[in-house]
Regions:
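Hydrophobic positions on the alpha1 helix immediately C-terminal to the Walker A/P-loop
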Residues: 34, 38
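Short glycine-rich substrate-engagement loop in P-loop NTPases that contacts/grips substrate
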Residues: 53-84
Length: 270
């Protein structure tokens, strides 16, 4: 699937002043898939690390303080050569900020010849890092324009943009709305978009929704240093009921009887 992030990644690769790139966003929006596809297309080889519970990787990055030693040990850990300008190093599922912190050393060189991308679903804790040390790029779910490209309807995009630019009626408005309804059914999830294109049975999307929901719940379970896990899960489970109401104000009583704002404020803000 063609994603807008691809344009950014190609520009990043060719930027002589590039830094280590941190791509962040919700789980299941296509971060890893897009980065690996980019790597396969643009580099001689891709060296991939899954940082989730990877103690050896974490210890290496905490211990080594120079670019050369970090690269050498990453090469040893992966049993692959890391070539300047020809290898893409991908560190996925970065949940430990010490990994990101270790990458700041690469930002001290004028021209970075090692191409490194970190992928994380963390957002809030990234604010402490400076842009001169690292590059950050948010990646969101599939938007409506990307969806229309995926279903091979670029012409409709042109009609919409022209009508918007000229402030004129869109000649295929009802057609666009039908496609928009189909898009909303996917939730902007790449896997759901692919399934909706290749299978007319919309009920199969429920399996993807359930899988993604379970993934989010699992992630909430790892955030014990940031929020109360039990209350975080209660807030998450109440979202469908909150959205069904005519009144758009968040109602704490829908979480459970007797709920108060001060008990859930931290979880809701997160």
């Amino acid at each position: 699937m063609e994603r807008k992030i691809n344009v950014y990644l190609n520009r990043w690769k060719r930027d002589v002043s590039k830094k280590v790139l941190v791509i962040y966003g919700n789980k299941q929006v296509g971060k890893t898939y897009s980065v690996l596809k980019f790597g396969e297309k643009e580099y001689k080889n891709v060296v991939y690390f899954n940082a989730d519970n990877n103690i050896e990787l974490l210890n290496t990055l905490k211990r080594e303080k120079t670019m050369e030693k970090i690269i050498m040990h990453l090469s040893l850990l992966s049993n692959e050569s890391i070539l300047t300008n020809d290898t893409l190093v991908v560190i996925d599922n970065v949940n430990d900020l010490e990994i990101i912190n270790a990458m700041k050393i690469f930002g001290k060189t004028q021209e970075l010849n090692y191409h490194i991308i970190l992928i994380t679903s963390l957002r809030e804790n990234l604010k402490k890092f400076k842009c001169e040390e690292l590059q950050f790029k948010a990646m969101n779910s599939v938007d409506f324009e990307e969806y229309l490209v995926a279903i091979n309807n670029k012409q409709l995009i042109d009609f919409i943009k022209t009508s918007f630019k000229n402030n004129t009626p869109m000649p295929f408005h009802s057609v666009a709305m039908d496609y928009y309804d189909d898009y909303l059914m996917t939730g902007g999830l790449p896997e759901a978009v692919e399934m909706s294109i290749n299978n007319s049975n919309k009920y199969l999307l429920n399996t993807i929704y359930s899988k993604v929901s379970d993934t989010y719940k699992k992630e909430i379970g790892t955030l014990d240093t940031l929020i109360d896990i039990t209350r975080g899960l209660e807030v998450y489970d109440s979202i469908p009921y909150q959205l069904q109401k005519q009144n758009r104000k968040f109602q704490y009583g829908l979480i459970k009887a007797g709920s108060r704002s001060k008990d859930y404020e931290k979880s809701i803000n997160f």
